[in-house]
Amino acid sequence: MVGANASSISTQYYKLAHLGSISYTIYTSSDNNDQALLELELTIRHKWPQILVTYYNKSLYYFVFGHNKVDSETIDLTKEFPQLSTKYTDTVNVDQFPNPHKSTKNDDNLAWASLSFLKATKKMILYNLSLSGAIKLFGNYCVAPTGDSVYSILCIDPILFQNGDLVVSCVEKPFTQLFSSSVAYPRNLAIDTNFVIYLIPSGIRCHLFDPTSLRNNLIEKPQIENGKLLELLKITTGVQCDESTLWVKLIPNLKHLNNQTSAIGKFIHSVENKKFILWPWDLCLLQFGKFEPAIEEEGLLESSELNNPLHLISDFLDFRIAHNTQLQQQRDSLSDQQQGETVNVPLSAGSVHATGANSFGNVPDISKDVDTVGLSTTTPIETDLFNLQNTEEFFKNDSIHMNLEDQIHKKETEPENESENDMEIDDLFGGDESDDNDDLEEAGNEEEKPTPSNNTIDKNGVIGNALEEAFIADATPSKENINLDSKIMPPDSTSEEAVPDKENFKPKETKPSYIDILKDKMTIEKIVNSPDYKDPGAPLPVVPTPLVSSTVSQSAVTTNPPSVGSAPGPAPGPAPGTETLYEANNAYAQSSQISQLPQQKSAFSPILFNPIIKSDIDTKYGKGGKFYVAKDSSTNGNLDMKNRSLRATSVSGMEIPFSSEDKKRLQQNLEVLDSSTTSDNEGGEDIEDDDNDYEDEGDDDEEEEGEEEEEEESDEDEISDIGKSTPLKLNTQNESVPPQQSNYNPVNITDSGSNTTNNITDKQGYENTEGFGTPFPNQISKYSIKPESPFASNELQSSVSPMYFDTSQSHQSPQLQPSTGTLEVLKASSLESPSKISESSNYLPLILRSINVSTIPSSYLMNNLISSKLLPSFTISDDDLENDLDITKSNEMIVKLGFLKEFLDFMSPNIIFDLGLMKNDESDYYINGVNDLLLNSDPGISSDWILNSLSKVFPCTYPMKLIELLYDFKSLELEDQLDSQLNFLNEIADEEDFVGPKALYRKLKALEWDSFSLNESNKTSFEKYKNVMEKLSAENTVSDDDYFKLPMVKTRILKNGNIVNLNNIGLKFWKYLNFSPVKKQKDFQILLIAETHRNTASYATEFLDQIIQNYKECNFGTISKVNLSTVETRSDLEPISDGLVLVHKEHDQSYNDFYIQTNKKLISLVELIKLDLINKTNNFEFGKPLLLFFIDFNDSSNSNVQVCKIFRNFKVALTTHQLPLVDIFTKIVPSSLLVKKVHHETALKVFSNYKLTKISMNLYNECPNDLANKSIVKNLFTTIVKDPPSKIQFKFMNSSYRDNSSNDDIFLHLAYERSIDNSWFVASWSDPLGRVVHVKSWYCSDSVSKSEKSTYRGDIMDIMSITDDIWSISTDLFKVLNDELGSFGGKKFLVLTRINSIIPDVELVHWKRLSSKHKEISLIVVSVRQTPRIVGSNESEDLGPKSNDYAPTPMIQDKDIFFGFKQTFSTSNTSSPSASGGALVTSPNSLSLHSPQQFLNAPANFLSPQDLIAPTSSGISGAKPGSSGIDPEVVLENQDNEVYGVIPKVPLPSFNSPTRFCMKTGYLMMQVNQPSEEEYKDDIKKTYLVYEINLLSCSNYWNLDVLMKLIMSQYKQMIALNDILCMNPIVGESDILGTHSRNNAIVPWHINAVGKLLDYLVHIYVDKD
């Protein structure tokens, strides 16, 4: 019956062919062009989809099956492609391909061909499935749909067995969900910052070029010659891409390009790479981060911020900003009423003296300049020192096609308080100068008379005032603002009339700003001849850099058009930008006017600091602090003429030619101003004249040379070029409003800017994510080339092909430049096609590079995306102890590197041994409508879907059953003499009559077929093969050594002073049966930490009393409460009474403040302990460990991080106060387990004895052993019973381990895993019996400096130090086990288990080093997955009456008979049968219980008199199944504990190394019931959990079958340890008793522990500063 069961269980394997021989041909390129071979492979596969061809080792391999070669189906590639030449050809039997090194032929070509064959088969399968639309190619595998726009990663690997079977393994990557790009646009179900992008088909991760808004990166119909890219995508994926598709501007992640994963703790981050590509938006997949909303209420933050002085200042500044904005609006309205003459204002700059207001309008598609807040493309996330709240206003994304007037009107109607969130920017970086004006100044501004300088005519004045009004409170204007109006204005549109009118207005004297950052002072000179600063070593401050407003980075000026209209500003001036512009050219500089300027000095220096800077202040960060100084400044004294021309602040870095002749030309063009403000001249003359504004800044040397040449050209051509240029010689190639002759068409978005940034500021977790986007926002189609480029500027947009483009090194200028090689290609191609620029092949790696999908995390959180450096919470009594609790504002998971080792020591046990209450993996915090997509999606990729998809493309495909893996083909191939003599019977008898297994196998082997060539012979052979296989499955029997049930696990307990062996179900009745631990009792002190509000402290006292009483009744020991008093001299210390530390928390108080208060109380506790020691009051028991029991009411994921920080600080304080004798252990329990909270009232739940006993068991396990003999091992309350020896070992006999291991051998299991971002390392140790259990984690780095090693004392370690530490711990644990067993003759085996991967080389080299050094320890290397797979079966469930979880054995006997076990395994030989039958159980008094086993088997209602049906003599109740009959021979057993072992006879590859066969593979199987559907279906199919174990290496004296069976038996024991170690959920107390906990029921505890802890640690960001 076992065979019948195995023949119905499905596997992940699907058979595609049965082969006899394979012919292969190796081709090389005639002209040694390896890249041509690579491209030729794609062409061949596209032309013949079913062909088996691949490029490998600089050759092209072509394979043909032997049975197809006779059919003339081979293709002569040399005739089709003359550039190919044949290198080698051969035909080999199929049994030589899987193991070419063991073949008789000593042929190197065969070794390469065997690897190439699997690659060619995999590519062919994936390509055909993609061609059919079933899957999408993704990385080294593919993705398959599981719902509407939801995909899961499907790993497809072909395998060739030695018997000729070609099968394909199809396994879903668990817990990884990807979404279609249509979810973000056009469906707009989530905001723009909570996802990462992966390319199809390569799987490379990319970043948005403009991270502030997805829509700024989308382009429709770009003017590029993208045919080559689309054609390459078509022949690679089989998917036709339309040229009119939507394109997106992306930056590839170079780290992921090298198969490395970014830090998961801050997975959405900035990148230093400044190269971008254009990619079809349809060929992108999104992975959304999990967002955890902040639990604080609105009033909560307001209350907490009042305690911070900086917040008080911020509130005050916000008030001043709003007040000054109102005054400014009143002044503007007055100016509009008195509007008279038209006065033109410069297009190039805002007010020089205004700090907040500027002359730039709110134009469509605004992309704020990140540099204005000190962020740059290379600025890492942790360097953002300020929590900038104003993401919505600071990075505003307006509609592209909205009219300017509509935008202005919309801006006017917006609430004025929108600018209040700009506090940090304005105040920390210069802000609005009106903030610094006092009331007198404001009154003076209101009383001033309007002059022609203040007014414009008609629509221009309205627009100008509105634009000024819109940005009066915003310190960061957009780059696109300048570009847009540069398109609007013709080049000669600046009026001269503004200059003489400036005398009519004299600005008021303003007092210095108290928060005036260096931004203004370093780039804008208030007084040319400054007497305050004289430094002979510095360049002379004769020429300021007064191009733009102090709040506008000069990159914004250089890349964006100026606004139009008047610029009243807080410090009014007629045309301040024009004034300084002409001063710079010495055309209208007047000392009298200059003397009118107020002298403002920086708050940081009493003198004015006026260096000559190459660009604005932010450039110094991008260029490494390079301050531009002319090379001839030290030798040539004539600096006026050399430096009169404005320096390089434009994108191109070109100097702007300007001369005195500008005056006349500007006067002549005064009348043009009105018409130029419209958008009708978008394709104006300025575009045509800006061809030379581009330069290549690929490296610093070229950049400096270009700057020298530009200076010379600027000096020579000042006069001649002025008429052809705008006042600023800008790169006016605007991507927001393109020239009319260009076909560049961004996505037509009509939403307002507020809708574009819909929910960015609504979530706490996204307050600062906009700064992470690296290259600058909204520069979609611009890059620079050298001035001698032959391209016109309107043609440059067409050159944005899907290749790498490099941006400028200047971080405020978002121009992009191609690499040198790319530039040469562009120049060459431009000669051939002046209208379009052909593509480069630089994007080939983005298509052909297959990224390993294992580098993609299953999930990542958005918690840490605010900033790693937040405003600290200052208090008057700030502790000297370094504390990182204040760097957390909301729900960030950030910890400092200092004392990280202690932090992890507290974190590990609280995460792992959590009573199953951790729900991090079960919580999906997706944003907005993504949750709806998940609800409509399937839980995974079903086997039926896989079979249907394969069958549509490859009709001759069928799923393999488990029994096919259990065939011993070697035994079937052996023929004895009797079989050879009776061969004539095969000819006499019919096929149906003779069904011997060997004869059937011979017939099976003779049939050759495949699913790739659809001819009649293949179909006929396939049908015959299936019929023979069905007969063979029915005829062949399975050995019990290959398919068996693992024995029951029993535990050791103490009952009345005697050791009793009991199955683990008896542990659930620990208190009822008065059991005791085998080890000695553990006593400790307890300190319960809880929050209180009003009168809610009673629950803590009640729970503490209950747990102390239960712990004692369970015979675990005694718990004493901590009571500490203070002394009169330390009245600041609060005494501790009754073991309680109650921290008051108001409902509007943040948990961060609560944690800080708790931390202070525990630090005070340390001082109380020290006072108790000094005063010798002996209230504190130093001989007992101290338990810190924390009741956690915070449901956020970061609560464990924060609480463990408190524990770490307490431990560090004990060391600081020289109290090493205090041994502490901790426990964090969620409040949901203990209390019920309704509104503001908190009450203790009613506990069952079972729940309290589980908590007591957990505390006993965690309590350290005797303090006198400290050890890393902590005794458990019970251990597993060791299996009795199967045979007697005689040591004087030379017996080997091939058949069995010695009873004295010591096995220690070590499971470990390293996170995919290589930042965390977790290991756990366990022996099979639970005598030693240990877990440890490390923060890992590939390279650790000597200073870090000495400073952080092992807080950060490299892989070599970690492996040494692991080996040292393993050696210590072997010593403990050796002392426990008292054996000296056995060997030591370390079962090294690598989770989720084979051992990589960087780890393998250290394990080899350590194992060769320590010969006494023998390594057994195993590879496993963290999670099991779910497989189906053709069997139907027995839909009988539902039974309880724990049923007597008679309920299971049908199952045992089904599996073919002749004798029951659950009968007890210790219990005595009762002859009185059911009459004895009619009342409690008549029930005789002679053993605990009988008590467990008593019915649930045995205490109530009622009639029961007596059991029959056979021991099985005569009642219906499910009735509560009693039989002393029946043992209570949990059905979930039934685990079966399967050892396939066929060698199989590892799940993560498909080309390498394991030494042995084994499967643990457990039947599970799928929930929720059983009530509605009549025919429920059985489902099994399958856990795969791969044996990779061991000593050669082992019998592999015996060793695998031994490992599986030990795994079964360690599965039972999950419950003993309190890792499983408490029944009825957890809301996650779903799929996740059910699936982990078959995983051993040490593997569960590693995965559980690592899944949490990867989301923690470590601050190394």
UniProtKB/Swiss-Prot annotation:
Pfam families: Med13_C (PF06333), Med13_N (PF11597), MID_MedPIWI (PF18296). Residues 551-568 have a biased composition (Low complexity). Keywords: Activator, Nucleus, Repressor, Transcription, Transcription regulation. Its main location: nucleus. Residues 728-762 have a biased composition (Polar residues). It is found in: Nucleus. InterPro entries: Med13_C (IPR009401), Mediator_complx_sub13 (IPR051139), Mediator_Med13_N (IPR021643), MID_MedPIWI (IPR041285). Residues 411-460, 482-512, 551-580, 673-781 are annotated as: Disordered. GO terms for molecular function: transcription coactivator activity. Residues 415-445, 682-720 have a biased composition (Acidic residues). Component of the SRB8-11 complex, which itself associates with the Mediator complex. This is Mediator of RNA polymerase II transcription subunit 13.
